[in-house]
């Protein structure tokens, strides 16, 4: 390497040479004398003789750029520089620290890189090896120029050509000087960051070295933990040695699990655990921690043993990942349930709390994926059920589906990570899959894979949290994008069998796949929000409380035996469940969607084959459903549809006349199960009755009915098995409109804000009693005309024609 003018007999060269000599090690003395000129060789030998300890840095370890950019100090000659360096090396008997000088030179160079400018030289572009040696002229910028450049750098570290030109004119600099200043400034920032990271790594390395040395020392001189004396070599068992290795591996894995959890939740959490890896789920009222025992995940709890084996994903134990995710989600749910303003604000109707998204992102360091809408709500209320019974219902996928038939189309438990502790459900953690629905063909079903985790915080206080385990992916025409953020409920026992339930729902979804008619409903939280879940829970628990009571209301038919009541209610439950599954096209009955050219695009037509199902007639089943907006309140629409005397206004099964209620079972206020008969029966309908179930709550209403045979219903009302009664349900789902305005559906209707209802009409019809028969276009058109005619009759009866 040719250092050119660095060793010239100029004042600048002498000073630089002296600095270079101060960095030479004794071992490189011979090599240095071979390249120095005669005048400098003597000084090099004199300087090297003063070095007491060998230095660690050689001249050949410095880059040509850093050597070339060393600025000479004015007013000093070679002798003064040499004397100064000699004093720094050995004067006063002090020990020389090579790293201190090396660090000071680097910092000095960095401090100049932002304010000094080498004419014609770029810190990123120059190639010292290809250019002939030459003297470098330095131009120090004025403080005003430096201030302007620094201010611009804070706003834009990478200015474009136009910005550099404007800056050069304003500061009276060449554009190349401005360009090189920014290049050098970026290099300086990068170097400082790397130095900081290196310092942290060095500290960590020093800690590991010290720990390694202490462990080695302990292995050389083992001490007995019982008596404190020296232990024999065989005292440390092989099993304990493996446990120590496993403990070290788990500590490393824990850090990776925390990082992976941040990807699921969209924000990062720093958890600090003690040496025993205690996994605390929170604190109880006494301030004590509640921790999982070592046998957590053993499956010895009260849940049925299902798939217990864990798999490994990317080298990380899946059970550890899911456990960390559940703990983080539980912590967030409890905070959301307990917090008030400014995190939560009251909705316009005052029925629920709405989440302040800005405050949420600040509180939980969350990042929202671009292109996704957010729905978040919180509702509290009293429910006639104790906390443990509710938690057990939520942790059982079948009972959960039965409790929320209009919300959950299908649910399965795919893996039980923990069945609880000490024979209880406390601490149960399981992986679930569910299809969540709104009863309309215009709202896609939400297929969600999520964790469900329950924990007892205190006596009579439980919490159940759900959190998605699917990362958000870009949707390319496939399944709807949905991410269920920490959601669930906190339940607290009060008195007389009641509980106070605080329900929180938080999700992110792709709004582009939702029909314009239903977007306001979902934004308001009435579609999948907390108000709907809590209202359904309150209605179902009220029904259960009435049914298990021994008293019979005056409106009920006393001729039905207790066994007949139970059998009839079970039949109505199956009818309602099949009705809901035929609207949103989940995978419960393997519906196949049809596309017919002359059918309205807002009408969903599906078909399936019914074979060997005693609860349905065999053959080809056709389902058709559509949703419309009506300028009528949900209560008014519900009262009209469930009134048997007004049924002749819209139902073709009534033969144009009123219907008579033969039997009734009350399930709550304005809801129950009825058995209807037409007063104008013809010869073909002499053996047919109508089974109808009606229910209503704050989130919506439901009217479901199905034709049934009279002989079969006699068996049911006497306590017989209802599973052999064949029926195909039809009916209506009524939802509040969510406060939509005149442009909500795009069909030109002018509608008042919040004054209407969203009506879903659905029919299931047997078009052919042969399962192998072909479905004809005429059958599809018949069902489509039936829906259109029914909607028009309802509009006319309510005097709300469009």
Curated annotation (Swiss-Prot):
One of its GO terms (molecular function) is DNA-binding transcription factor activity, RNA polymerase II-specific. The gene is ANL2. GO terms for biological process: anthocyanin accumulation in tissues in response to UV light; cuticle hydrocarbon biosynthetic process; plant-type cell wall modification; root development; root hair cell differentiation. This is Homeobox-leucine zipper protein ANTHOCYANINLESS 2. One of its GO terms (cellular component) is nucleus. Pfam families: Homeodomain, START. Transmembrane segments: none annotated. It comes from Arabidopsis thaliana. Expressed in roots, stems, leaves and floral buds. Belongs to the HD-ZIP homeobox family. Class IV subfamily.
